[in-house]
Amino acid sequence: MKKIIFLLLIIPIIKYGQNNNSLKFNHQALLVNDLNQSGDFYNNILGFEEIEVGASQKPPKRWFKSDDGMEIHLISTKEKLKSIPKGVHMAFSVKNFDLFINNLKGNNITYGNWRGDENQIQLRNDGYKQIFFQDPQGYWIEVNNIK
């Protein structure tokens, strides 16, 4: 009987914690060797808005925000960074996939499908299109047309 009473008391607490304390994505921090080159890429190619850095500038940083409020924080480093496999990537959706592809082509940015075939678009089983490319530091980015 004591176990039943305990469960009846604790279930509302667990439910409250799940509903009112859920995680919300805030930002992705990336180490970069060339802060200007990487920052310009996220600003000019991906269209992220540069925002004020709300932290110390040691080490130097640049922060960016997407239209939906997702933030990318670039942090300068002198250490040599290891290459990252394509399976570890950030993914973004765009309304006009073809316009985005033309923007990449106009800026001489190579993209491809999951296998790595250059300038090839991946058509997923669910009908959505996706491409993969790398930022100047070598981080993998997926762009798709998921609504």
Predicted region positions:
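Exposed loop/turn and edge beta-strand positions of beta-sandwich/beta-sheet ligand-binding modules
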Residues: 58, 86, 127
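Short beta->alpha transition motifs characteristic of CBS
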Residues: 124, 144-147
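Core segments of cupin and vicinal oxygen chelate
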Residues: 30-71
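Vicinal oxygen chelate
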Residues: 33-36, 90-137
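Bacterial Sec-dependent N-terminal signal peptides
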Residues: 1-21
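Mid-chain, structured segments of secreted extracytoplasmic proteins
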Residues: 62-105
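N-terminal beta-strand motif that seeds the catalytic metal site of vicinal oxygen chelate
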Residues: 17-36, 88-92
